[in-house]
From Swiss-Prot:
Record: active site: K69
Enzyme class, spelled out: oxidoreductase
Stated pH dependence: Optimum pH is between 8 and 9.
Temperature section of the record: Optimum temperature is 60 degrees Celsius.
Naturally occurring in which organism (per UniProt): Helicobacter pylori
Enzyme Commission number(s): 1.1.1.25
Pathway stated in the Swiss-Prot or TrEMBL entry: Metabolic intermediate biosynthesis; chorismate biosynthesis; chorismate from D-erythrose 4-phosphate and phosphoenolpyruvate: step 4/7
Protein name: Shikimate dehydrogenase (NADP(+))
GO biological processes: amino acid biosynthetic process; aromatic amino acid family biosynthetic process; chorismate biosynthetic process; shikimate metabolic process
Length: 263
């Protein structure tokens, strides 16, 4: 049986559960796919050229995580779907000898929310994940605000129609989303007292990090604010990516079931 290689680019990457859940799917669906896929973590030096690495490794597809999603958008031969709007790519697939970029973070995040009636969201951070979330939440009719410590990247959100801030707005929000990398450094993304104010009035504190109780989620728990980590988003975006890797042979709900069973 033919072997195909896949992977996930990131820095850091050792924490990633993507290899675990994707390899479970490649093993489960190898008969339907007609090939055996192997998916591995790829630690990419910060100055690396993603496309060169992708081609050098002979990959058929890959995911892209922190801090490369915006850079991945720049190197694709073609961009499809909501990735065109959000300027960030987390899924790379070879289609007809072209490197095609998708974004499955956006829909993956929305599916992970479970269709609750949220009306407003505050996104902390302005990177590739924040862009994808802002695009999807706007599309779903929510009022989206973005808070970032610097002006870097905020022009994108302004063009999108989000309210943008460098100082914490004195407002209330249904969703407070940590899309920064602060949790990976075991830090809060924002002043503790300011966060407390948002959590007390909010309906859900959501951290894109997963696998441990982050300082952000710990504070929400302390205040008895409903909270959620990024595990379900990870699995949904991975299942949506797997659908792309399988050339739509394996619909994402089937992939999701397998991935959920191992993580």
């Amino acid at each position: 049986m033919k072997l195909k290689s896949f992977g996930v680019f990131g820095n850091p990457i050792k924490h990633s559960k993507s290899p675990l859940i994707h390899n479970a799917c490649f093993l489960t669906f190898q008969k339907e796919l007609g090939f055996l896929g192997h998916y591995h973590p790829i630690l990419l030096p910060l100055e690396s050229h993603i496309k060169s690495e992708f081609l050098h490794l002979g990959l058929s597809g890959a995911n892209v995580t922190l801090p490369f999603k915006e850079r991945a958008f720049q190197i694709c031969d073609k961009i499809k779907g909501i990735a065109l709007e959000c300027g960030a790519v987390n899924t790379l697939v070879v289609e007809n000898d072209e490197l095609v970029g998708y974004n499955t973070d956006a829909l993956g995040f929305w599916l992970s929310l479970g269709g609750e009636g949220y009306q407003s969201a505050l996104i902390l951070g302005s990177g590739g994940s924040a862009k994808a979330l802002a695009c999807e939440l706007q599309k779903q009719g929510l009022k989206v605000s973005v808070l970032n410590r610097s002006a870097r990247g905020l022009d994108f959100f302004q063009r999108l129609g989000c309210d943008c801030f460098m100082d914490p707005p004195k407002s209330t929000f249904d969703l407070i989303i940590n899309a920064t990398s602060a949790s990976l450094n075991n830090e809060l993304p924002l002043n503790k007292e300011v966060l407390k104010g948002y959590f007390k009035e909010g309906k859900l504190a959501y951290d894109l990090a997963y696998g441990f109780l982050t300082p952000f989620l710990s504070l929400a728990k302390e205040l008895e604010t409903p909270f959620q980590d990024g595990k379900d988003m990870l699995i949904y975006q991975a299942a949506l990516s797997f659908e792309k890797f399988s050339a739509s042979q394996i619909p994402y709900p089937k992939a999701f079931e397998v991935m959920r069973s191992v993580f």
